[in-house]
Amino acid sequence: MVPHEFVTTAYDLPGYRVTRNFGIVRGIVVRSRSILGTLGAGLQTMVGGNISIFSNLCEQTRSDAFELMIQHAGQLGANAVIGMQYDATEIMQGVTEVLAYGTAVEVVPASK
């Protein structure tokens, strides 16, 4: 399993050096909004501000995609992920794909 602190958007991990590259890893989650959630969000738009129903859904979806990416990296034998990014695409109205991806690597302390 890859520790969360060994996942970075940078292309290196300070204090460590890459000894092996396992390639691209990803976690993909596809979510749809429920009818009730859409109605609740519609009511929130009337008063303005943050639409918490969608914010919470987005945050949970990103978290799920992140965990799937870490799981994928661990299955390959990696202990870190570098160059991590998120992407999102609306597949159809109300259905969104969230992708977390990066490069799975093995790192060791730089002093070794």
Swiss-Prot record:
Q: Which Gene3D superfamilies match?
A: Hypothetical protein apc22750. Chain B
* Stated family: Belongs to the UPF0145 family.
Task: Please identify the protein, giving its name as recorded.
Answer: UPF0145 protein Acid_4599
Q: Which organism is it from?
A: Solibacter usitatus (strain Ellin6076)
